[in-house]
Amino acid sequence: MLSREDFYMIKQMRQQGAYIVDIATQIGCSERTVRRYLKYPEPPARKTRHKMVKLKPFMDYIDMRLAENVWNSEVIFAEIKAMGYTGGRSMLRYYIQPKRKMRPSKRTVRFETQPRYQLQHDWGEVEVEVAGQRCKVNFAVNTLGFSRRFHVFAAPKQDAEHTYESLVRAFRYFGGCVKTVLVDNQKAAVLKNNNGKVVFNSGFLLLADHYNFLPRACRPRRARTKGKVERMVKYLKENFFVRYRRFDSFTHVNQQLEQWIADVADKRELRQFKETPEQRFALEQEHLQPLPDTDFDTSYFDIRHVSWDSYIEVGGNRYSVPEALCGQPVSIRISLDDELRIYSNEKLVASHRLCSASSGWQTVPEHHAPLWQQVSQVEHRPLSAYEELL
């Protein structure tokens, strides 16, 4: 029998659109069990007794593994199954559960995922010099669970748009997508997480749908769940940002990061595997899900009304729009590299580079050509017509 936590996880994942087979893989049970639990309105009452006949020959081995601090029931299940165990997972869990109180609270079992199964996301921050000024650099780290290969994106903010951009760039860098993305409870991804009942940010759900991954959130105050990526945040602070302290721009930061990953991070030896992330990624890459045809649009979105002189105002400056749109609403998108795109009825009608107000109004002459034609079309009269009035 599954736990109450597993019951609510099944319900939640199904509500978020997960397939039965993916839920079964995540929970560690059969698809038939998932379907049965989806029919229950409430968690079924736990049976008071389990028949341990099938498990009894393996109890000494299980106790030995627990003494070695191996508490992952899936790992133990795979091991005893190879030794001839024919029972189910629930029997093993029932046996392990009362023994968990013996587990030291500060010790954490490392859960090893299969290739392409999971990517862990987290933010870090550090103060360095950019363009001659001391400033805070935020950096998003996206780590593949199997290979430990990671991608880093430095940005001025940790908002939703930069969070999504970091994942877009990571998927492009890896050349494929994963099945699940594990995030902390930042507002860019999670609006509410109440005892496992997660409400995800709608933008993050759109990103998940675009790349066909299942979003997952850490339990509150349980950051160790994504320990792989948190170790990489610490690694960056103690390695890259110790080596490099001055940058020309955020673009320069990202260029240096990419070079450092290729030269240093990808080639470090992972002690538990005796392999490098580069070597393990060679095994994982072929399992990644294919990328969609287009990148997810991470631009800022807003609405503007075109003035009667055929301009819109953005960020304290004015930008021209085709005169036919005077007085009409238009939608705008501002990319993270400051490209302004203007749409009418979802059709691109103008584009500009964002500029400060001191740079002056930004005008495309073709936008206002019809207006100038109207002004120039005045009636021409011979001089004799004016002489007759004298």
From Swiss-Prot:
It holds the Pfam family rve. Residues 5-66 form the HTH IS21-type domain. Keywords: DNA recombination, DNA-binding, Plasmid, Transposable element, Transposition. Residues 111-285 form the Integrase catalytic domain. GO terms for molecular function: DNA binding. It comes from the Bacteria. InterPro entries: HTH_IS21_transposase_type, Integrase_cat-core, IstA-like_C, RNaseH-like_sf, RNaseH_sf. Residues 20-39 bind DNA. One of its GO terms (biological process) is DNA integration. The keyword DNA-binding applies. Disulfide bonds: none annotated. The keyword DNA-binding applies. Belongs to the transposase IS21/IS408/IS1162 family. Involved in the transposition of the insertion sequence. PANTHER family: INTEGRASE PROTEIN, TRANSPOSASE RV3428C-RELATED. This is Transposase for insertion sequence element IS21. The gene is istA.
